[in-house]
Design a protein with these regions (language model features):
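Short glycine/threonine-rich loop-to-helix capping motif typified by GTGT followed
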Residues: 215-224
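N-terminal catalytic or cofactor-binding beta/alpha core of small enzyme domains
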Residues: 1-157, 161, 174-175, 181-185, ...
């Protein structure tokens, strides 16, 4: 059982099937708190979701207005997306060469070229409070998965152009962990707790620069302090951080960013340049 099937069973979700968008087969399960979409293809290239949801909302609104059932309304329903959607959460399998058992989360974006979905030099919107809620709940359940590392990842890959914040929640790093029911249960219950009992941490939000792809210092900061994090750029991407990119990191948080947080020892040869941006 994977994360999606576990949530469907736990929440008694209602199923709707669609096969009318770009030859995609799309199944949506819904409950009072969220909707779960099963999609074909790579989540890293899911820039089309806004358009698909907008079209569905437009048709539904047209049906309600004219009563004909033909969906004869026109234009994208961007207002519907803004009104009814808060965030896109992708449930994903994490892969790494180490195959180390890991429970992780991260925002998405490309600081340079787009080799894994999204657009070059574009960051997705972030929801710092939601990621912090999730990581705190995950950490509180760590005793149930003692062999797993619990860590955030630096911002990477697509999608990058969705109209709402994007958060990837992942179990890794091999097939054994993907089907581990302890990991699936802890991940799903931590996510549900974060949605149902959401808490804002918007007073202290920062962007983070430096460290490794699995930034232990920033993970500890997220868990042990009242700070929430927006985009995180690892030391490997610091050469791509200029004033424009730093401004984008700040602007793409839906909660006001008040801090720029540096891993001082993890800035490498870019330290002087980054400090003087």
């Amino acid at each position: 059982m994977n994360m999606a099937s576990y949530l469907i069973a736990q929440c008694g979700m209602k199923e709707e099937v669609y096969a009318d968008y770009a030859e995609r087969n799309i199944t949506i399960y819904s409950c009072p708190y969220f909707a779960l979409m099963l999609i074909d293809g790579s989540a890293l290239e899911a820039e089309w979701i806004d358009e698909w949801l907008s079209e569905r909302m437009r048709k539904r609104r047209g049906n309600e207005v004219n009563g004909t059932g033909d969906g004869s309304s026109s234009g994208r329903d961007d207002d519907g997306i803004s009104r009814y959607i808060n965030c896109y959460i992708f449930l994903s399998r994490h892969r790494s060469e180490s195959n180390k058992p890991t429970l992780t989360s991260h925002s998405t974006g490309n600081f340079s070229h787009a080799s894994m979905g999204g657009n070059a030099r574009e960051l997705a919107y972030t929801y710092p409070s939601l990621q912090k809620c999730y990581m705190l709940n995950l950490y509180s359940n760590r005793g149930k998965v003692p062999n797993y590392d619990i860590v955030i990842e630096a911002t990477h890959h697509g999608p990058t152009s969705l109209a709402k914040p994007v958060l990837f929640i992942e179990i890794g790093s091999s097939e054994r962990e993907w089907s581990d029911m302890d990991a699936v249960s802890v991940t799903c219950h931590s996510l549900l707790a974060s949605i149902v009992n959401f808490k804002e941490y918007s007073k202290k939000v920062g962007v983070a620069l430096g460290g490794t792809h699995y930034p232990e210092k920033f993970t500890n900061l997220l868990i042990d302090s009242d700070i929430a994090l927006a985009s995180v750029a690892s030391k490997h991407n610091l050469k791509h951080i200029d004033e424009s990119m730093l401004r984008q990191m700040i602007a793409k948080s839906i909660e006001p960013v008040r801090y720029i947080i540096l891993d001082w020892k993890g800035l490498g040869g870019e330290k002087d340049r980054i400090v003087n941006l």
